[in-house]
Design a protein with these regions (language model features):
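An amphipathic alpha-helix adjacent to DNA-recognition modules
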Residues: 8-13, 47-70, 74-77, 81, ...
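Hydrophobic alpha-helical connector segments
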Residues: 71-105, 157
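C-terminal peripheral helix-coil segments that are non-catalytic and often amphipathic
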Residues: 128-212
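Amphipathic alpha-helical segments used for helix-helix packing
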Residues: 86-88, 99-128, 171-173
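Short alpha-helical scaffolding segments that buttress acidic/His motifs in well-ordered protein cores
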Residues: 91, 95, 108-115, 160, ...
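N-terminal intrinsically disordered/low-complexity leader segments
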Residues: 1-6, 77, 207-212
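Helix-turn-helix
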Residues: 10, 18-52, 56-60
């Protein structure tokens, strides 16, 4: 790793940790340069400004996540024998695996904080750069669940994503048992979430009620 690449990576890791603790708006470049052991000129050279740095921190893992999701979806998309569980596996497993990576927990805390604070930068980034990924999954879910209209499908996808976000945070009620390996616990989490999501997505459409 060259000195330039090492410096850039050090800034990104320090920024991720700082944003997880303080949020995007609560973090200053002075704090960042101190944590990364660099000067302000290095941050400006590699990223230009704080907004660009935030984007790079987010995209560093989100690009990887969505590349893996699309690769997994490629294997099952459009096939007559594809099951709902297989498509959910392509959506869920890559996200959980990234959350288990080194630094993944910190990234998830940063992401959860941004969601909780309703950060519009995150919403815009997801829409502009990863909207096509969600549309591909939505199209495949729609193919497998023709009884759902578009609005109902998107509601259910949104709730599945919420459950996935909780699982990625590792902050749920279910903790790893002492006699279960970490790898086995991760697989249990994946399988339980896929079954839960399949039940929620696949059930019949809701009855339409009219007010009297």
């Amino acid at each position: 790793m060259t000195t330039t690449v090492a410096t850039k990576d050090r800034i990104l890791r320090a920024a991720e940790e700082l944003f997880a603790r303080r949020g995007f708006d609560g973090s200053s470049l002075r704090e960042l340069t101190s944590a990364a052991g660099v000067n302000l000129a290095a941050v400006s050279y590699h990223f230009g400004c704080k907004e660009k740095l935030i984007e790079k921190v987010l995209r560093r893992r989100l690009d990887q996540l969505n590349t893996q999701r699309m690769a997994a979806l490629d294997h099952v998309e459009g096939r007559p024998d594809t099951t709902l569980e297989q498509v959910l596996d392509a959506y869920i497993r890559p996200a959980l695996e990234i959350s288990y990576d080194v630094g993944g927990e910190c990234f998830m805390r940063m992401l959860a904080r941004a969601f909780a604070e309703r950060d519009e930068r995150l919403r815009e980034l997801l829409s502009q750069n990863y909207g096509h990924v969600m549309r591909r999954f939505a199209a495949e879910f729609a193919r497998l669940l023709p009884h759902l209209d578009k609005v109902e499908l998107y509601w259910r996808m949104d709730l599945v994503t919420g459950a996935l976000t909780l699982a990625m945070s590792g902050f749920g009620m279910i903790q790893r048992a002492e006699n279960v390996s970490e790898q086995a616990h991760h697989e249990q989490t994946t399988q339980h979430l896929i079954r839960f999501a399949a039940a929620g997505l696949g059930q019949g459409g809701l009855a339409r009620h009219t007010r009297q």
